[in-house]
Protein backbone atom coordinates (compact mmCIF):
# COMPACT_ATOMS: atom_id res chain seq x y z
CA UNK A 1 0.00 0.00 0.00
CA UNK A 2 1.27 3.45 -0.85
CA UNK A 3 1.34 6.18 1.75
CA UNK A 4 0.26 9.71 0.93
CA UNK A 5 0.36 10.99 4.53
CA UNK A 6 3.14 9.13 6.35
CA UNK A 7 2.65 11.01 9.61
CA UNK A 8 -0.85 9.54 9.93
CA UNK A 9 -0.53 6.32 7.97
CA UNK A 10 -0.98 2.98 9.69
CA UNK A 11 2.41 1.98 8.29
CA UNK A 12 5.06 3.37 6.02
CA UNK A 13 7.11 1.98 3.15
CA UNK A 14 10.81 1.40 3.69
CA UNK A 15 13.43 2.06 1.03
CA UNK A 16 15.57 -0.78 -0.32
CA UNK A 17 15.59 -3.71 -2.72
CA UNK A 18 13.70 -6.00 -0.33
CA UNK A 19 10.80 -3.56 -0.12
CA UNK A 20 10.77 -3.10 -3.90
CA UNK A 21 10.52 -6.87 -4.31
CA UNK A 22 7.65 -6.99 -1.83
CA UNK A 23 5.79 -4.20 -3.63
CA UNK A 24 6.26 -5.92 -6.98
CA UNK A 25 4.92 -9.22 -5.61
CA UNK A 26 1.99 -7.35 -4.06
CA UNK A 27 1.22 -5.92 -7.51
CA UNK A 28 1.13 -9.42 -9.01
CA UNK A 29 -1.29 -10.61 -6.31
CA UNK A 30 -3.60 -7.61 -6.56
CA UNK A 31 -3.84 -7.87 -10.34
CA UNK A 32 -4.58 -11.59 -10.01
CA UNK A 33 -7.51 -10.81 -7.69
CA UNK A 34 -9.09 -8.45 -10.23
CA UNK A 35 -9.10 -11.16 -12.90
CA UNK A 36 -5.62 -10.35 -14.20
CA UNK A 37 -6.93 -7.23 -15.93
CA UNK A 38 -4.88 -4.07 -15.53
CA UNK A 39 -7.31 -1.87 -17.40
CA UNK A 40 -10.95 -1.89 -16.31
CA UNK A 41 -12.00 1.49 -17.66
CA UNK A 42 -14.14 1.08 -20.82
CA UNK A 43 -11.75 3.04 -23.01
CA UNK A 44 -10.40 2.34 -26.50
CA UNK A 45 -6.71 1.51 -25.95
CA UNK A 46 -5.75 3.44 -29.09
CA UNK A 47 -7.02 6.66 -27.48
CA UNK A 48 -4.87 6.24 -24.36
CA UNK A 49 -1.80 8.39 -24.97
CA UNK A 50 -0.92 9.96 -21.62
CA UNK A 51 -1.16 7.92 -18.43
CA UNK A 52 -0.50 8.84 -14.79
CA UNK A 53 -0.07 6.37 -11.95
CA UNK A 54 -0.59 8.08 -8.57
CA UNK A 55 1.18 6.45 -5.63
CA UNK A 56 3.30 4.66 -8.21
CA UNK A 57 5.90 3.15 -5.86
CA UNK A 58 8.26 1.10 -8.03
CA UNK A 59 6.35 1.92 -11.20
CA UNK A 60 5.48 -1.72 -11.80
CA UNK A 61 1.86 -0.95 -12.72
CA UNK A 62 3.09 1.41 -15.45
CA UNK A 63 5.53 -1.23 -16.71
CA UNK A 64 2.75 -3.80 -16.91
CA UNK A 65 0.35 -1.38 -18.61
CA UNK A 66 2.97 -0.42 -21.19
CA UNK A 67 3.51 -4.09 -22.04
CA UNK A 68 -0.26 -4.36 -22.57
CA UNK A 69 -0.81 -1.13 -24.50
CA UNK A 70 2.30 -0.57 -26.58
CA UNK A 71 1.56 -3.27 -29.19
CA UNK A 72 -1.53 -1.15 -30.00
CA UNK A 73 -0.67 2.05 -31.94
CA UNK A 74 -2.21 5.27 -30.68
CA UNK A 75 -4.96 6.83 -32.79
CA UNK A 76 -2.96 10.04 -33.19
CA UNK A 77 0.27 8.27 -34.07
CA UNK A 78 2.21 9.58 -31.08
CA UNK A 79 4.12 7.45 -28.58
CA UNK A 80 2.53 7.02 -25.19
CA UNK A 81 3.72 8.91 -22.14
CA UNK A 82 3.79 7.15 -18.77
CA UNK A 83 4.09 9.33 -15.66
CA UNK A 84 4.60 7.87 -12.19
CA UNK A 85 3.67 10.19 -9.32
CA UNK A 86 4.36 9.56 -5.65
CA UNK A 87 4.94 11.65 -2.55
CA UNK A 88 8.23 9.79 -2.04
CA UNK A 89 10.84 9.01 -4.72
CA UNK A 90 12.31 6.19 -2.60
CA UNK A 91 11.17 3.40 -4.93
CA UNK A 92 11.35 5.13 -8.30
CA UNK A 93 13.25 2.96 -10.80
CA UNK A 94 16.81 4.06 -11.46
CA UNK A 95 16.49 3.20 -15.16
CA UNK A 96 13.42 3.46 -17.36
CA UNK A 97 12.43 4.09 -21.01
CA UNK A 98 12.54 7.65 -22.34
CA UNK A 99 8.74 7.89 -22.45
CA UNK A 100 8.50 7.16 -18.70
CA UNK A 101 8.79 10.01 -16.22
CA UNK A 102 8.70 9.95 -12.42
CA UNK A 103 7.98 12.93 -10.19
CA UNK A 104 7.12 13.74 -6.59
CA UNK A 105 3.47 14.67 -6.05
CA UNK A 106 1.04 14.22 -3.16
CA UNK A 107 -2.53 13.72 -4.38
CA UNK A 108 -3.84 15.77 -1.45
CA UNK A 109 -1.89 18.84 -2.57
CA UNK A 110 -2.95 21.31 -5.30
CA UNK A 111 -2.40 19.99 -8.82
CA UNK A 112 0.55 21.65 -10.59
CA UNK A 113 -0.57 23.72 -13.58
CA UNK A 114 1.51 21.63 -15.96
CA UNK A 115 -0.45 18.48 -15.03
CA UNK A 116 -3.98 19.86 -15.29
CA UNK A 117 -6.10 18.38 -18.08
CA UNK A 118 -3.18 16.27 -19.29
CA UNK A 119 -4.10 12.60 -18.94
CA UNK A 120 -6.35 10.11 -20.71
CA UNK A 121 -6.09 7.68 -17.79
CA UNK A 122 -5.19 8.21 -14.15
CA UNK A 123 -4.64 5.15 -11.98
CA UNK A 124 -4.56 5.03 -8.17
CA UNK A 125 -4.07 2.04 -5.89
CA UNK A 126 -4.09 1.34 -2.16
CA UNK A 127 -4.33 4.59 -0.24
CA UNK A 128 -6.65 3.11 2.40
CA UNK A 129 -4.03 3.34 5.13
CA UNK A 130 -3.26 6.98 4.47
CA UNK A 131 -6.48 8.98 4.09
CA UNK A 132 -8.34 10.86 6.79
CA UNK A 133 -12.08 11.45 6.60
CA UNK A 134 -12.68 14.10 3.97
CA UNK A 135 -9.42 13.40 2.14
CA UNK A 136 -11.15 11.29 -0.51
CA UNK A 137 -13.12 14.36 -1.62
CA UNK A 138 -9.84 16.25 -2.09
CA UNK A 139 -8.22 13.32 -3.88
CA UNK A 140 -11.16 12.86 -6.26
CA UNK A 141 -11.19 16.56 -7.14
CA UNK A 142 -7.45 16.54 -7.82
CA UNK A 143 -7.69 13.37 -9.89
CA UNK A 144 -10.44 14.99 -11.97
CA UNK A 145 -8.17 17.99 -12.55
CA UNK A 146 -5.45 15.71 -13.90
CA UNK A 147 -7.78 14.34 -16.59
CA UNK A 148 -8.59 15.70 -20.00
CA UNK A 149 -12.32 15.70 -20.93
CA UNK A 150 -13.37 12.10 -21.56
CA UNK A 151 -10.48 10.69 -19.53
CA UNK A 152 -10.92 8.05 -16.84
CA UNK A 153 -9.97 7.51 -13.20
CA UNK A 154 -9.32 3.91 -12.16
CA UNK A 155 -8.82 3.46 -8.42
CA UNK A 156 -8.06 -0.04 -7.09
CA UNK A 157 -8.68 -0.19 -3.35
CA UNK A 158 -9.36 -2.30 -0.26
CA UNK A 159 -11.94 -1.53 2.40
CA UNK A 160 -11.64 -1.53 6.18
CA UNK A 161 -14.55 -3.92 6.64
CA UNK A 162 -13.28 -6.91 4.66
CA UNK A 163 -9.52 -6.21 4.90
CA UNK A 164 -9.09 -8.71 7.76
CA UNK A 165 -12.50 -8.95 9.37
CA UNK A 166 -13.65 -12.16 7.67
CA UNK A 167 -10.57 -14.28 8.28
CA UNK A 168 -11.42 -17.21 10.61
CA UNK A 169 -8.46 -16.65 12.91
CA UNK A 170 -8.83 -15.24 16.41
CA UNK A 171 -5.37 -13.67 16.18
CA UNK A 172 -6.09 -11.96 12.85
CA UNK A 173 -9.36 -10.62 14.20
CA UNK A 174 -7.60 -9.22 17.26
CA UNK A 175 -5.18 -7.40 14.99
CA UNK A 176 -8.00 -6.22 12.75
CA UNK A 177 -9.86 -4.76 15.73
CA UNK A 178 -6.70 -3.04 16.97
CA UNK A 179 -6.08 -1.45 13.56
CA UNK A 180 -9.72 -0.38 13.13
CA UNK A 181 -9.80 1.28 16.56
CA UNK A 182 -6.53 3.06 15.78
CA UNK A 183 -7.88 4.35 12.46
CA UNK A 184 -11.11 5.50 14.08
CA UNK A 185 -9.20 7.30 16.84
CA UNK A 186 -7.02 9.06 14.26
CA UNK A 187 -10.05 10.05 12.16
CA UNK A 188 -8.93 7.97 9.19
CA UNK A 189 -11.25 6.87 6.39
CA UNK A 190 -12.20 3.21 6.87
CA UNK A 191 -14.29 2.83 3.72
CA UNK A 192 -12.42 4.51 0.89
CA UNK A 193 -14.46 2.80 -1.87
CA UNK A 194 -17.77 4.12 -0.51
CA UNK A 195 -16.25 7.56 0.00
CA UNK A 196 -14.96 7.53 -3.59
CA UNK A 197 -18.36 6.65 -5.06
CA UNK A 198 -20.06 9.37 -3.00
CA UNK A 199 -17.47 12.01 -3.91
CA UNK A 200 -17.33 11.09 -7.60
CA UNK A 201 -21.12 11.01 -8.00
CA UNK A 202 -21.35 14.47 -6.41
CA UNK A 203 -18.50 15.93 -8.47
CA UNK A 204 -19.78 18.28 -11.20
CA UNK A 205 -17.10 17.23 -13.70
CA UNK A 206 -17.39 13.45 -13.33
CA UNK A 207 -19.82 10.90 -14.78
CA UNK A 208 -20.17 7.15 -15.35
CA UNK A 209 -19.15 6.34 -11.79
CA UNK A 210 -19.03 2.61 -11.06
CA UNK A 211 -17.69 0.05 -8.61
CA UNK A 212 -16.83 -3.63 -9.06
CA UNK A 213 -15.93 -5.86 -6.14
CA UNK A 214 -13.57 -8.81 -6.52
CA UNK A 215 -13.00 -11.44 -3.84
CA UNK A 216 -9.69 -13.09 -2.98
CA UNK A 217 -11.16 -16.58 -2.66
CA UNK A 218 -13.16 -16.30 -5.88
CA UNK A 219 -9.96 -15.34 -7.68
CA UNK A 220 -8.93 -18.99 -7.42
CA UNK A 221 -6.37 -20.99 -5.45
CA UNK A 222 -3.40 -20.48 -7.80
CA UNK A 223 -1.87 -17.73 -5.65
CA UNK A 224 -3.38 -18.70 -2.30
CA UNK A 225 -0.07 -18.66 -0.44
CA UNK A 226 0.91 -15.33 -2.00
CA UNK A 227 -2.49 -13.80 -1.20
CA UNK A 228 -2.15 -14.95 2.40
CA UNK A 229 1.38 -13.58 2.59
CA UNK A 230 0.48 -10.14 1.19
CA UNK A 231 -2.52 -9.63 3.45
CA UNK A 232 -0.82 -11.06 6.54
CA UNK A 233 2.14 -8.73 5.99
CA UNK A 234 -0.24 -5.78 5.82
CA UNK A 235 -2.05 -6.86 8.98
CA UNK A 236 1.04 -7.63 11.07
CA UNK A 237 2.99 -4.56 9.93
CA UNK A 238 0.11 -2.26 10.83
CA UNK A 239 -0.24 -3.98 14.21
CA UNK A 240 3.47 -3.74 14.95
CA UNK A 241 3.62 0.00 14.27
CA UNK A 242 0.54 0.70 16.40
CA UNK A 243 1.82 -1.35 19.33
CA UNK A 244 5.29 0.21 19.12
CA UNK A 245 3.84 3.72 19.04
CA UNK A 246 1.58 3.00 22.02
CA UNK A 247 4.48 2.64 24.43
CA UNK A 248 2.52 -0.05 26.24
CA UNK A 249 4.64 -2.36 28.42
CA UNK A 250 4.90 -5.77 26.81
CA UNK A 251 4.09 -4.45 23.32
CA UNK A 252 6.83 -6.52 21.71
CA UNK A 253 5.60 -9.71 23.37
CA UNK A 254 2.01 -8.91 22.38
CA UNK A 255 3.01 -8.41 18.76
CA UNK A 256 4.90 -11.71 18.77
CA UNK A 257 1.85 -13.49 20.22
CA UNK A 258 -0.49 -12.05 17.59
CA UNK A 259 1.75 -12.38 14.53
CA UNK A 260 3.00 -15.88 15.28
CA UNK A 261 -0.49 -16.97 16.31
CA UNK A 262 -2.01 -15.68 13.06
CA UNK A 263 0.61 -17.46 10.97
CA UNK A 264 0.03 -20.69 12.88
CA UNK A 265 -3.76 -20.38 12.48
CA UNK A 266 -3.43 -19.96 8.72
CA UNK A 267 -1.03 -22.89 8.31
CA UNK A 268 -2.90 -25.22 10.68
CA UNK A 269 -6.40 -24.57 9.35
CA UNK A 270 -5.55 -24.09 5.67
CA UNK A 271 -7.08 -20.63 5.72
CA UNK A 272 -7.51 -18.66 2.49
CA UNK A 273 -7.59 -14.96 3.38
CA UNK A 274 -11.14 -13.76 2.60
CA UNK A 275 -11.12 -10.11 1.53
CA UNK A 276 -12.40 -7.81 -1.22
CA UNK A 277 -10.65 -5.58 -3.72
CA UNK A 278 -12.67 -2.77 -5.29
CA UNK A 279 -12.16 -1.31 -8.77
CA UNK A 280 -13.60 2.20 -8.86
CA UNK A 281 -14.15 4.12 -12.09
CA UNK A 282 -15.22 7.62 -13.07
CA UNK A 283 -15.03 9.56 -16.33
CA UNK A 284 -14.45 13.28 -16.76
CA UNK A 285 -17.20 15.09 -18.66
Curated annotation (Swiss-Prot):
Pathway terms, separated by semicolons: Secondary metabolite biosynthesis
Source organism, top-level taxon: Eukaryota
EC number(s) per entry: 2.1.1.-
One Gene Ontology term from the biological process aspect of the record: methylation
InterPro entries linked: Methyltransf_12 (IPR013217), SAM-dependent_MTases_sf (IPR029063)
GO molecular function: methyltransferase activity
Gene3D superfamilies: Vaccinia Virus protein VP39
UniProtKB keywords: Methyltransferase, S-adenosyl-L-methionine, Transferase
One Pfam family in the UniProt entry: Methyltransf_12
Protein family (similarity comment): Belongs to the methyltransferase superfamily. LaeA methyltransferase family.
Role of this protein: Methyltransferase; part of the gene cluster that mediates the biosynthesis of gregatin A, a fungal polyketide featuring an alkylated furanone core. The PKS grgA synthesizes C11 and C4 polyketide chains in the presence and absence of the trans-enoyl reductase grgB, respectively. The polyketide transferase grgF is then responsible for the fusion of the two carbon chains to produce the furanone skeleton of gregatin A. Next, the cytochrome P450 monooxygenase grgG accepts performs the oxidative cyclization to furnish the gregatin scaffold and leads to the formation of desmethylgregatin A.
Protein name: Methyltransferase grgD
Amino acid sequence: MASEKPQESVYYLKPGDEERARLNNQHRVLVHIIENELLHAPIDPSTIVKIADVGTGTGIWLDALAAHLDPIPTAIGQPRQYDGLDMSPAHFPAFHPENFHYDVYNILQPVPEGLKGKYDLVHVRLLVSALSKGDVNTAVDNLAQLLRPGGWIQWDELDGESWAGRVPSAHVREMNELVRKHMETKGMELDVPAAFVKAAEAHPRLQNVSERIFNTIKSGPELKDDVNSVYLWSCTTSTKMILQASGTPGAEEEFKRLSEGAKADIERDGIFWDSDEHVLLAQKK
